[in-house]
């Protein structure tokens, strides 16, 4: 059984769209088999985002280490207009994150 942090090229593609709202803004992310939380925005990520977005101090830059398909970096870039750098070991997740950056009209280095 593959883990999301492995680059398992034998997995069958099952592309899908994840839709969610944070801070009253809508997001759509491309997802696929072989990535973390491929079916939905996981509870931990939702709680993390809702918590950090309440902070008054907004960072001018951030590193999204283990970005997956990009929900944290994308939401934080849109909310904070911060310089965002995203990185992940999973090649499929990185390709999806690149697509999600473009489709959510944010700027990030990945």
Where are these regions (language model features)?
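Short glycine/serine/threonine-biased micro-segments
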Residues: 22, 32, 42, 64-68
């Amino acid at each position: 059984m593959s883990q999301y942090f492995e680059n398992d090229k034998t997995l069958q593609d099952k592309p899908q769209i994840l839709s969610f709202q944070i801070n009253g803004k809508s997001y759509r992310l491309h997802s696929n088999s072989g990535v973390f939380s491929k079916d939905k925005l996981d509870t931990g990520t939702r709680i993390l985002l809702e918590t950090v977005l309440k902070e008054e101090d907004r960072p001018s830059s951030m590193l999204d280490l283990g970005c997956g398909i990009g929900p944290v970096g994308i939401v934080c870039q849109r909310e904070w207009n911060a310089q965002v750098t995203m990185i992940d070991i999973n090649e499929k997740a990185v390709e999806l994150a690149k697509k999600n950056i473009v489709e959510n009209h944010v700027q990030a280095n990945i």
